Amino acid sequence: MGKHLVKNGFTSDYTRWIYHGESDRGREEVLRQRIDEFDDDAGVGDMLNDYHEAHFEEARREEEPEATAKAYYEMLSAAQQPLHGHTKVSQLDAIARLMAVKSQFSLSRDAFDIKLTVFGSLLPVGHILPKSMYEAQKLLRALKMPYEHIHACPKGCILFRKEYAEAKYCVKCESSRFLEVDCGDDQKKQLAIPMKVLRYLPFIPRIQRLFMTEESMKQMTWHKNGRRYNPEKLVHPSDAEAWKSFDAIYPARALEARNVRVALATDGFNPYGMAAAPYTYWPIFVIPLNLPPGVLFQRHNIFLSLIIPEHLGNNMSVYMEPLIDDLLHAWEEGVWTYDRSTKTNFKMHVWYQYSLHDLPAYGIFSGWCVHGKFPYPVCKESLKFIWLSKGGKYSSFDKHRQFLPPDHPFRRDIKNFTKDVVVTAPAPPMMIGAAVRAQLDALEVNNEEGGFLGYGEQHAWTQKSCLWKLPYFDDLLVPHNIDVMHTEKNITEAIFGTIMDIPDKTKDNVKARVDQATLCNRPQLNMVPPRAGKSWRKPKADFVLTRAQRKEVLEWFQMLMFPDGYAANLKRGVNLATMQINRLKSHDYHIWLERLLPVMVRGYVPEHVW
């Protein structure tokens, strides 16, 4: 009875909140599922059946698979024989399960060899289980994906490939390609240890694998053949104007539903943790956009393509050379790919659709600095931010009103925005495509300081992105996108810090009060002059909580009960000593903004603020 109640609860019609982290299975089922993950041969069996249908049924076969796919299928066929005479488990199934266990539990090579030896001694005579990891890897060789280690200049000037493949020193800065040791008498010797290595995993073979089974092949044409239950809603990138615009410009490419559009995503991270010395890796991921919405952003459909061993900066174009070369080849010449569903080979074309990242990476990818006087990369210098004299920085305050409809009441509001200012100007024009390329081509290089002449005064270009090498880049309406979760986290963090009046995190500081007194008509927020030897006083704003109210809010957070995995950090991170919540992540801020903010401040702030 106890197990039944734990599993099913007291109410028979209780709705389980599985999308909020609540489990819908008992622990026994979860454990059994983990075990079954290493005992499921359905996927391998389906691939073998697909191969036999394609290779032996002459009535259905139209073409032989192309070379890579053929080697892949032949490996599967050779590995289909049973492990021994008394089982249906194939050699490939057994190796795949054992390799999965090795990966999950981080077994060493020696430990894996011993495990194979022990298992082999328990099997009947004549079994074909490999005796070592070397033999297992040899059998699985056709399953492996290619990867490259490319030596790079320590300063990021060049990659030692193509015409520089044999060079030992950088042709631009003369830095050594390899580690040097002092041999005395001012002599140095190069060791066979590269100073910097770029790791590249070609993405095209990984995309080709998606066409080798019928199920994934159908998913790769969903963008064109998939059913939309509500055509008025945007449920997929193919429903957007940018996708349709590209189809209209290149109808021949768009006609073939199997052609693939990809997105690039990147972000920097410290592999050694936040407490370690500052060091940044920049992985670049490739995402096929043809897939249905439900599987588009699943982990196995996001391909790691580049691992850049430093902050991107202005060297992004150098490190992305291999990726751009593959994109150029896939666009201009195409790649022969085997289609499992039609048993034919077709020439697959792949092209870049857009990138996805946070705002700083947006500036790196686009080549336009997102800080300073012209931080808006779409309108560029047409939208000039204002300078805050006390804050010592540029601000976008009140620049949003020009984007509103001409009859919007906010345009005529002279009280709640910049005082005594009515906005009649239209929205600045968006610069895209050929106009941006023409502006880039007209820039003059600053030979003395580097960069381009006029930077910071006339424009904010820091570099010409390597993406402009793509012949179709001019025709992309939205070549770059900002990650919503990053943006939401930054905005929510600022709101939370301001409401809770957290030092160094609140936007309602003394400098902001002085600047708003100059710009706005809000006398209740102006700094109060000193009296009788006292210092300047900052009046409390209606949207800021008192210390007692902040304590009540944090104690309320500690009492909140959430489903497992939903927002546990909000409770665990409360620190009453500092009146803060620590270790919050993007998802936690999302929950706070969407669910908790209205409840948290109601009753503490005036009705017009709430």
PLM region spans:
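A structural signal for the principal folded core domain
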Residues: M1-W610
